[in-house]
From Swiss-Prot:
Organism of this sequence: Streptococcus pyogenes serotype M28 (strain MGAS6180)
Native organism taxonomy: Bacteria, Bacillati, Bacillota, Bacilli, Lactobacillales
Protein name in UniProt: Valine--tRNA ligase
UniProt subunit comment: Monomer.
Coiled-coil stretches noted in the UniProt entry, renumbered to this chain: 808-882
UniProt entry keywords in alphabetical sequence: Aminoacyl-tRNA synthetase, ATP-binding, Coiled coil, Cytoplasm, Ligase, Nucleotide-binding, Protein biosynthesis
Enzyme Commission no: 6.1.1.9
Motif ('KMSKS' region): 519-523
GO biological processes: valyl-tRNA aminoacylation
Single annotated GO MF: valine-tRNA ligase activity
Any one of the GO CC terms: cytosol
Length: 882
């Protein structure tokens, strides 16, 4: 047995420990075929850069689950991996190249992809280093990457199979276009923001010049693609105009007036311009009326040759130029400023352009129905908290076909080939013969990520051991922000291709926010690097904070004050452990367990030993129950209370009555209970704090704590009588301590304590444990009886089953106390005067921030409460004096 260092130093505790775990292969599945499998696939982080605090939270929760299940005897697999993150990673690499004055087009596809692979290797190494510092118990022998050949094979098979079923198709439709990244986006990759904009009202003159029709748009630059104006066929103002033409301003070409219910007579003038290549609703109108589709924009957001004099302009520059020209021609009626919702690319931040484009799509109706129906079966996915099941179903009910092609180079190239005759070949391998060219587009990143739970297990080979044993996986841990992006897609793809749910449970957590509740972001500059936190506090402190503040579905606020509290708690555990082990006298864990069994059988020990074992039992039961419900925050509070309050503050202190005695036999029992309880605490904490618990465990046991048994409830430890008795004992001691504090009497001053109880069992219990009462209350005189009469002037405390009297004459000198209270009253009056003066200052109230004013008001209320309480104490003292 070695000795813990005098001071807890997380850097020393954690240094080299992770590599020792890896060298010992303790993170791999046990391979025990009799053990029940439990598997988790890590949500693969993007290889775009370093991991943030949200990743640290997400992976900490997974590690807690897998470490506990490993200790409980499950055959555990936690499979790690990373995502190629097509658009995000490509954007990062292009940004790096731009700094060197190079574009991807300068390099060409192959050389550019070489650069991206270099980036991937660089950041994959960084991510794995971060995982190590976090202590994640993943099995690196099964590490996967979404562009691995095995996963690529699965992607190709899924694409081909869905294509053959008619559920993947290629067509020209309005899609969300990112002009910065020059690629299509799915609906959920578009973030809508309220921005200041305008409705531009303009007149389109009838061909005969008899009148003008007024239309309005937020995007006047698209008018060069107008092919009609629409009115409602039932609108009496315009129904006679259907079939006639208007003159498109600037362009001076004739476009027809069509009757279509898309035009709402109640909205605006009831006339809408129709631009089928640049608006999804207009596209539908165009389809119904067989209108041409005129695309007036290049893929980089500049205007093309169909915009005439405005060709080559950026779309926003063209907007202003178009408006100026309309005004010059007298066609601009007015500009109506307003705030409206505008779609932005989730990745590049660019304003998204609705644009006609030929893309590949997944037909979603059957896949969505299958996923929704499955939630009514035993094969369903259970969401924690359950409300997210409704979120999932609501999205599936309203889902649109999924655009899966991306105009990128980094990703899974679409397995479709074209020849000069216009034929399309879709297959897992390239077609035989010459003259075929593969589609240059790649698949949406989420297409491959949707296959992650089963492609990582070897699918489409369903005979491999990992797929048969560990799929479906047990639990997925992820944030609520990607339920639509990822969770939903994994569910419907897994059901379609394996017939099983991808995971049995989904634990949904929230977002990490700053101390003020704001989302962490680069723009706010409030992001926190988890590695900086680990360097200062250690990984265990960060993990404790992340788990202890965690409730399913809820956000968590980060603060350094909370990190200080986390470190302090671990330091407390360290100091308790050091105290116990220094007083252990060579006792082994096996000997301690044998002696504890005697305590449970009432063959040795005392009531406080029985009490702590009973409470340990309850703690194990409650922590295990809350872990099973993924209520890690609740479990953390239970552990904290047991360790700090019941074990450290009470039991460890109570044991000094024995350890400082001459009774060697009792000392052995007490040391045994201390070591046994410490061991169970360390095991309970290990899933959350792996480093410090391994260090403590190594002081009294052989091997690694990673694979030892998790604590279980022992019925023999249940002892309600001991629990009840010691709780009353604690109540008595607390009551005396509180009374001393209330009248400012030092703990060192002996006092008279009278305990009156009509409960004979409680009287016997207090009497037989009088040494504990004396040790904690320092009485000059202690009397316990049912016949005690209440003194006339005494501090009285009532606890369950007893009344406690502390005669005031023994407690204080009334004259000295009155003098002290007068000084205290003057202090509170001074504080009240100062804060009252500040709040009475009109300039201060007018100029100070609301939160500053509220802070002063809170101080005023606090000082007033203290002033009033002091006045009450003075009145009590004067009553005693008289």
């Amino acid at each position: 047995m070695t000795e813990l260092s005098p001071k807890y130093n997380p850097a020393e505790v954690e240094a080299g420990r992770y590599q020792k775990w890896l060298d010992a292969d303790v993170f791999k599945p046990s391979g025990d075929q009799k053990a029940k499998p439990y598997s988790i696939v890590i949500p693969p982080p993007n290889v775009t850069g370093k991991l943030h605090l949200g990743h640290a939270w997400d992976t900490t929760l997974q590690d807690i689950i897998i470490r506990q299940k490993r200790m409980q005897g499950f055959d555990t697999l936690w499979l790690p991996g990373m995502d190629h993150a097509g658009i995000a990673t490509q954007a990062k690499v292009e940004e790096r190249l731009r700094e060197q004055g190079i574009s991807r087009y300068d390099l060409g596809r192959d050389k550019f992809l070489d650069k991206v692979w270099e980036w991937k290797d660089e950041y994959a190494t960084t991510i794995k280093e971060q995982w190590g510092k976090m202590g994640l118990s993943v099995d690196y022998s099964r590490e996967r990457f979404t562009l691995d050949e095995g996963l690529s094979k699965a992607v190709r098979k899924v694409f081909v199979d869905l294509y053959k079923k008619g559920w993947i198709y290629r067509g020209e439709f309005i899609i969300n276009w990112d002009p910065a990244a020059r690629t299509a986006l799915s609906d959920i990759e578009v973030i809508h923001k309220d921005v200041e904009g305008a409705f531009y009202h303009m007149n389109y003159m009838l061909e005969d010049g008899s009148r003008a029709l007024q239309v309005a748009t937020t995007r006047p630059e698209t008018m060069f693609g107008d092919v009609a104006v629409a009115v409602n066929p039932e609108d009496p103002r315009y129904k006679d105009l259907i079939g006639k033409n208007v003159i498109l301003p600037i362009v001076n070409k004739l476009i027809p007036i069509v009757g279509d219910e898309h035009a709402d007579p109640e909205f605006g003038t009831g006339v809408v311009k129709i631009t089928p290549a640049h608006d999804p609703n207009d596209f539908e109108v165009g389809q119904r009326h067989n209108l041409p589709q005129v695309n007036v924009m290049n893929d980089d957001g500049t205007m093309n040759e169909l915009a005439g004099d405005f060709a080559g302009m950026d779309r926003f520059e063209a907007r202003q130029a178009t408006v100026a020209k309309l005004e010059e021609l007298g066609a601009l009626v007015n500009i109506e400023k307003r705030v409206h919702s505008v779609g932005h690319s989730e990745r590049s931040g660019a304003v998204v352009e609705p644009r006609l484009s030929t893309q590949w799509f997944v037909k979603m109706d059957e896949l969505a129905k299958q996923a929704m129906d499955n939630q009514e079966t035993d094969n369903r996915v259970d969401f924690y908290p359950p409300r997210f099941n409704d979120t999932f179903l609501q999205w599936m009910e309203n889902v649109h076909d999924w655009v899966i092609s991306r105009q990128l180079w980094w990703g899974h190239q679409i397995p479709a080939w074209y020849n000069a005759e216009g034929e399309i070949y879709v297959g897992e391998e390239a077609p035989e013969g010459d003259g075929w060219t593969q589609d240059e587009d790649v698949l949406d990143t989420w297409f491959s990520s949707a296959l992650w739970p089963f492609s990582t297990m070897g699918w489409p080979d369903t005979d491999v051991e990992d797929f048969k044993r560990y799929f479906p996986t047990s639990t997925l841990v992820t944030g609520y922000d990607i339920i639509f992006f990822w969770v939903s897609r994994m569910i419907f793809q897994s059901l379609e291709f394996t017939g099983r749910q991808p995971f049995q449970n989904v634990l949904i957590h929230g977002l990490i926010r700053d101390e003020e509740g704001r989302k962490m972001s680069k723009s706010l500059g409030n992001g926190i690097d988890p590695m900086d936190v680990i360097e200062k506090y250690g990984a265990d402190s960060l993990r404790w904070f992340l788990s202890n503040g965690s409730a399913p579905g809820q956000d968590v606020r980060f603060s350094y004050e909370k990190m200080d509290a986390s470190w302090n708690f671990i330091n407390k555990i360290w100091n308790i452990s050091r105290y116990i082990l220094m007083n252990n006298e060579g006792l082994t864990l096996e000997e301690a367990e044998s002696n504890v069994a005697k305590v449970a059988a009432s063959e040795a020990g005392n009531v406080t030993d029985q009490w702590i074992l009973h409470n340990l039992n309850e703690t194990i039961a409650k922590v295990t129950e809350n872990f099973d419900k993924f209520e890690f925050g609740v479990a953390g509070h239970i552990l904290y209370n047991f360790i700090w309050e019941e074990f450290a503050n009470w039991y460890v202190e109570l044991t000094k009555e024995v350890l400082y005695s001459d009774n060697e036999a009792e000392k052995v029992i007490t040391r045994s209970v201390l070591l046994y309880t410490l061991d169970k605490i360390v095991r309970l904490l290990h899933p959350i704090m792996p480093f410090v618990t391994e260090e403590i465990y190594a002081q009294y046991a052989q091997g690694s704590i990673v694979t030892v048994d998790y604590p279980v409830v022992r019925p023999a430890f249940e002892n309600e009588a001991a629990h009840k008795g010691v709780e009353r004992l604690k109540d008595l001691i607390r009551a005396v301590r509180n009374a001393r504090a209330e009248v400012n009497v030092a703990p060192s001053k002996p006092i008279t304590i009278l305990v009156k109880t009509a409960d004979s069992e409680l009287e016997d219990f207090f009497t037989s444990n009088v040494n504990y009462i004396k040790r904690f209350t320092n009485p000059e005189k202690l009397e316990i009886s049912s016949a005690i009469a209440a003194p006339e002037l005494a501090m009285t405390s009532i606890i369950t089953g007893a009344e406690i009297y502390l005669p005031l004459a023994d407690l204080l000198n009334v004259e000295e106390e009155l003098a002290r209270l007068d000084k205290e009253l003057a202090k509170w009056q001074k504080e009240l005067d100062m804060v009252g003066k500040k709040l009475g200052n009109e300039r201060f109230v007018a100029n100070a921030k609301p939160e500053v004013i509220q802070k002063e008001k809170d101080k005023q209320a606090d000082y007033q409460a203290k002033y009033d309480a002091t006045q009450e104490r003075i009145a009590e003292m004067k009553k005693i004096k008289s």
